């Protein structure tokens, strides 16, 4: 995540404040994070995404639709505090003799989608939100990719963590996201209608719960009144 860590942290906290304003959530990178290796009380969420890379030795550029982004989440109800650890797996140049593993670069749009997906998963797993999970939205790619995934130069593949290819969506040229984005993750998100606030599901769930409580109170009052009148 390099120098973009603060961007991820800020965007994540803003999204969490929209749905859980009284709870404190933090996000931090952890290069030692491994899939399916969880501490007690922790949960996992993985996304395979589209991103760009640049070799620090020869300046060669390439793109991949199979970049693994790993999240581990933990929620303490007693402290009203949650934490997320994040790892973005790297790739290396296939042309250089001794290449370094490079961090991926992501568009702002895909960063936002990744984090929205993450928040949905937190609501589902940590708060047991009673909304229906929809399918994750394919990541946006700004170029066409040809050929198989280069597993020999993929950090996740070399460590045995890579999965099959993911579905990505190409944008028309007029809607192509900026290539030089601030961050570096991409994911699979859930499809929500254009202009619809992704967190309206959580808000609707909260309203329905409050309405149910109100109805129960009204019914209880009516029963008490009837009992009192009958007794008189």
UniProtKB/Swiss-Prot annotation:
Subcellular localization: Membrane
TM annotation in the entry: 212-232
GO CC entries: cytoplasm; membrane
SMART domains membership: zf-3CxxC
Cytoplasmic side: 1-211
Domain of life: Eukaryota
GO biological process, one term: detection of chemical stimulus involved in sensory perception of bitter taste
Keywords: Membrane, Metal-binding, Transmembrane, Transmembrane helix, Zinc, Zinc-finger
Main location: membrane
InterPro entries in the record: R-trans_p, ZAR1/RTP1-5-like_Znf-3CxxC
Tissue expression pattern: Expressed predominantly in adult liver. Expressed in testis. Also expressed in kidney, lung and fetal liver. Low levels in heart, thyroid, adrenal gland, pancreas, ovary, prostate, skin, plasma leukocytes, bone marrow and fetal brain. Not detected in brain, spleen, colon, small intestine, skeletal muscle, stomach, placenta, salivary gland and uterus.
Zn-finger region bounds: 3CxxC-type: 49-160
Topology with respect to the bilayer: Single-pass type III membrane protein
GO molecular function: olfactory receptor binding; zinc ion binding
Similarity remark: Belongs to the TMEM7 family.
Biological role: Promotes functional cell surface expression of the bitter taste receptors TAS2R16 and TAS2R43.
Record text on subunit structure and interactions: Interacts with TAS2R16.
PANTHER family: RECEPTOR TRANSPORTING PROTEIN, RECEPTOR-TRANSPORTING PROTEIN 3
Name this polypeptide is given: Receptor-transporting protein 3
Source species: Homo sapiens (Human)
């Amino acid at each position: 995540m390099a120098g973009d860590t603060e961007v991820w942290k800020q965007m994540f906290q803003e999204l969490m404040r929209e749905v859980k304003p009284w709870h404190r959530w933090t996000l931090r990178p952890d290069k030692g994070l491994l899939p399916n290796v969880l501490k007690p009380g922790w949960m996992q969420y993985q996304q395979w995404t589209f991103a760009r890379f640049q070799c620090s030795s020869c300046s060669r550029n390439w793109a991949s639709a199979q970049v693994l982004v790993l999240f581990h989440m933990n929620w303490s109800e007693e402290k009203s505090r949650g934490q997320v650890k994040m790892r973005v797996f790297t790739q290396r140049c296939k042309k250089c003799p001794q290449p370094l593993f490079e961090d991926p670069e992501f568009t702002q749009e895909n960063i936002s989608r990744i984090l929205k997906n993450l928040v949905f998963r937190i609501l589902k797993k940590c708060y047991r939100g009673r909304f229906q999970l929809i399918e994750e939205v394919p990541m946006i790619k700004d170029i066409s990719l040809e050929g198989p995934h280069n597993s020999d130069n993929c950090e996740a593949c070399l460590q045995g963590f890579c999965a099959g290819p993911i579905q990505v969506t190409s944008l028309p040229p007029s809607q192509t996201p900026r290539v030089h984005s601030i961050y570096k993750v991409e994911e699979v998100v859930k499809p929500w209608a254009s202009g619809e606030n992704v967190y309206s599901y959580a808000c609707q769930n909260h309203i329905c719960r409050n309405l149910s409580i109100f109805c129960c109170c009204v019914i209880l009052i009516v029963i008490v009144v009837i009992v009192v009148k009958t007794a008189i």
